[in-house]
Amino acid sequence: MRYNEKDKLIELSVREIAFSLDKTYGEKYISRRLRAKIGQEAHTYYQNNSEGHTEYYIQFIHEISGWKAHIRGRADIVHKNENSVHIEEIKSTVSDIENVSQDITQIMQLQLYCHYFHFYEGYNNITASLIYIDPVNNKEKHVDITPNSISNILDEIINGIISQIENELLKKSVNKKRSNTIKFPYKKYHKYQKEIIENISKNVESSIITMLNAPPGIGKTMASLYPSLKFIISQNKRLFITTSKTTQQEIYLESVKNLLKKGSKFKSIRITSKQKICKTDTYDCDENDCPLFEKYFNIENNSLPEQLLKLDLIDRNSIEELSNDHSICPFELSLDTALECDIILSDYNYIFHPRIKFQRFLDTFNNSVLIIDEAHNLIDRASSYYSESISTSQITEIINFVKHSSINEEIKLKISTHLKRLINHISRLKDQVRDLEFDNEIINIDIQFFDNFQKTFDNLLIEYINDLPFKLNKKDAIIKFSDHLKFFTLLLKETNTDEFETVLDIQTNNLRILCKSASKKLTEQINKFDSVILQSATLTPTEYYQSMLGLPKNVSILSYPSPFPPKNSLYLIDNSISTTYKERKMFISNIIKLIKDVIELKQGNYLIFFPSFEFLDIFKPHLIGSSISFNILSQDRNMTDKSRAKILSKLKNNTSQILLAVMGGVFSEGVDFKGDMANGAFIIGPGLPKISFDQELKKSYFEKYYGNGFDYAYKFPGLTKVIQSAGRVFRSNTDRGFVIFMGHRFSTDSYLNYLPTDYDIKFKNIITEINRFWSHN
C-alpha cells in the first residue's frame, strides 16, 4: 500500500484488501513455500488449458471520506461476452479436496472482481467460481460463489485503512515533538565522540552510507545510536540494529536503557530467534499445524502487542511471559510488536539471510536506517548464507528414515527410489575428477536435473505429509531435507557467475556450492535502506572492506585513533619465533618461556589468543605441564553463554588467571575485560585462515578481480582478528596493559604496515620493556 497525503490518494491491490480480512500472514516457512511453488504450477497448468482471459487486469477508483482508493488486481481467469461474465480464482490444496474449507481471502477477491464488472463494466449477469486443484492426485473441485454487494464491506475496509493513515500522519507530528526528548545520556563526551555524532547525523539526513572505523573507548555504540534514533523518530522512520553475536546486542541494550533513563521517548524490541523462543515441537508456523500460532491469530481484537508496547524496552522475558500467559506464539507476537517499535535489534540473519530475513518489514526498509555492528564479521557470515552442500551419506540417512516411517509401503518405495536417483547422480560426478593436490574438484552441475528432481520430490513430499497418521514435527528428517534441497537447488541457478563454485568432496561424496564472495548480495540488501552505518574497530584497509561488503565508492569514511593515553599501553613484537603452520610446534617451548617470564613481572590476569582451536589444543597440555603457577582457563569449541559468563566472572573476581582463547571467537570481540580482568595479551601469529581448497579458490577469485589474492583471502581476515583480540586489553582511560605480537611475520612490512599506527610498536628486549612499563605505572 502507498498513499499520497497531498492528493489524498491510496494505491491498493485487490490482494491487500482481501487479506485485510485474514491476519494470518506469518513468515513464509517451509511448507508454505512448498505449497506456493506447487500452487503456482497448478495455476499455470489450469490457465494454459483455459479458453478464458488469464491474469485479467482490473482497476477502479473507490471514493470515501474525502480520499480516493485506486484499486488494482488481476483475476486468474475471466470468461466474458456481451451479456455475461464468469470469473474463476484458482486455489491449490494439499488437503482432501472433497472436504476443503473455503478461503475467505479468495472469496473476497472474487467478490471484488464481481464488484468491478458490475459497477465499472456494466455487467448484471455475473457468476464466479473457486477452482480447487489437488496437483498430487490430479483432482479438481469447482465451488460456485454467489456475487454479493460488498460496497459496505469495502467502505469499512478502506475507512479502516484511512484511519491507519491518519493515525500515521498524526504520529508524524507527534514524533517531531518526541524527537526533542532524545537527549545524549552522559554528562561528557568521549574523545572524538561528539565529532562522530555530528558526522553521522549529517550522513543519515543525507541518506549516505557511513563506514565508522573506531577503536575501543570512543563510545561508537552511542555515537551511532543517538543521532540515528533522533533522526528516525523526527522523520517517522525505523532503526534496525543488527549484530553477529548476542554479546554485542547486550551492549546496545545497555545504551538503550541509558537513553530511556534520561527521559528519551521511544520503543525498542530485541528479536530472539525462532529456534530459541519456540515453545512447541510442531513443525510448521501455520494456523493448521501449531496450536500456539493458531490461537495467536484467533484472539478477538488482538491487543497483545499493545500490552507489550506499554513497555519502552521489550525483551525476551517480557515476550515469553505474555505469550505463556495466553498460550500463544511468542515469535509472532514479537514480530507484530516490532511493527510499532522505533528500534529493532536482531542478529545478522534477520536482515541478510536469504531464507530467514524479515519478510513483513521488506517494504519499509527504504524508510529505515540500519546500523551494522562489528561489520567485519558480515563478510564470512554472508558468504556462508549462500554456500550449501548435499551428500550421499545425508541422502542415505533420509532413505533409512523413510524405511522406518509410518507411511504406506507404496509411498516409501516412491520416495526411496527417487532419492537413490540423486545418490547415483552425485556418485557419477566423480567421472569429472582428476588427480589434484586436494581431495576436492571443481565440477559442472546439471542444474536441470536438480530442478526436475526438486519438482518431483515436492509432489512426493505432499503424499508423505498426507499419509502421516500424526501431525508433522519440525524436526522431521524429510521435512528438513526438503527445505535443504530447495535452497540448494535455488542456489545452483546462481552458480553461473564467478562468485560461486560447485565443488565435489571426493572422499565423502559431498556436493557443495561455495560462495567465494557475497558482496553483490550485500549490495542488494544494503541498498534497500534509507541510510546505513557500518561500524567496527577493524574496517581497514578501507578498500578491502568496501569491496567485500559491496559498498559504493562514495561512502563516508570516518576513522579515528585510540582515545586512550599512550602511556597506558605497550605494544611489542617478538620476532624470534615462528608461528607458521609447519614450524609452530617447534617453538611452543619458546612461547611458554616468554609467557612465564612476562607474567612473573606482575600478578594479574592474562589472555593468550591462538589462530585456531587446533593450535590451542596442541599448546594447552604443554602449558599445563610447564608447572605454571597461574590458573588456566580455556575456551571450548561449543561454549555456552553460561560457561562463557563463568570464565568472565573468574577473571573479574580473581587474579593469577590465564585465559586461552581463539582469535575471532567469543572472547576476542564483543566483550569488555575492564580494569584488571586483563593486564596483558599474547597474540600468537597473524591469525591467517588455514590453507584449504576453499581458501585457495577465494584467493584465485580475489586475484582476478582485485589483484590482491593472498591479502584478501588470508592476510586481511587474519589481521582483523589480531586487532580485535588486541583491543580486549584496553577498554577505558584507566586500563593499563601490554600486547605482545608473537611471530616473525609481524615484523615484516607486509604485516606491520597494516597494524594501527597508534600502536607505537617496540622491538627491543621484551622483558626489559615490560619491566620498565610496570615500574612507570
What are the residue ranges of the model-derived segments?
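Metal-dependent nuclease catalytic cores that hydrolyze phosphodiester bonds in DNA/RNA
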Residues: 1-84
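Mg2+/Mn2+-dependent nuclease catalytic core
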Residues: 60-154
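Conserved pre-motif I regulatory segment
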Residues: 172-213
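A substrate-engagement module of RecA-like helicase motors
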Residues: 183, 235-344, 352, 432-439, ...
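Walker A/P-loop
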Residues: 205-227
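Signature of the SF2 helicase/ATPase Hel1-core->accessory helical subdomain module
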Residues: 224, 230, 250, 326-343, ...
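A contiguous, basic/glycine-rich beta-loop/short-helix subdomain that forms a polymer-engagement track
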Residues: 319-344, 355-361, 460-578, 586-587, ...
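Conserved RecA-like P-loop NTPase helicase motor core
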Residues: 575-586, 637-745
